[in-house]
Amino acid sequence: RGTSKGWRPWPPLMSNVRPHENQRRMSPRSVTLRLMTAHDLPMLHEWINRPHIVQWWGGERPSFQEVQEHYLPWVLGKENVTPYIGLLDGEPFAYAQSYVALGSGDGWWEDETDPGVRGMDVSIAQPELLDKGLGTSLVRALVELLFADPRVTKLQIDPAPHNLRAIRCYEKAGFRQVKQIVTPDGPAVYMLCERPSPVSSRSAA
């Protein structure tokens, strides 16, 4: 998973998911997810160096070579992270990733014993698109996609305590605050989203 939740590796999951599967639409605009490819790396490098991303992702400004070295193994399915590009009306506008929490390494989730737990991170690349409900739609789309895998038991996310925008977004998407924790990146709010209970096949009399 790496030593930072900034541009460095977070810890393949769902490598068989094809672009545009399990898409979720919001009216009147469409928010979808596709797998990230190597062709997205220059765009991702530019995104990661935008001020509002730097603010929340560790303050570092990596070179393209550094971004390529860290993200290309994920794209190629060589590590335990799956990266996605969020699309707004078909155009890239956000980055998202999921990872298997168990065995993340580097001090992350050392007490985790459930192989079905997935972590996730999201970030909107365009600051002008913040506070428009798109983050919530993106998180919901990723939640839906991940829970489509029957192996997944629950989802977790760990925003910084002062990132109130992110915390509100995740709560709207179905996450709940569990506790304050200390991660290798510092203090965080540990949030969980449980798998929805199966709908009973028996109809009410």
What residue ranges belong to the model's regions?
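Acetyl-CoA-dependent GNAT
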Residues: 68-129, 145, 195-196
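Conserved GNAT-fold acetyl-CoA-binding loop/helix
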Residues: 52-72
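Conserved beta-strand-loop-alpha-helix junction that forms the acyl-donor binding cleft
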Residues: 156-167, 183-187
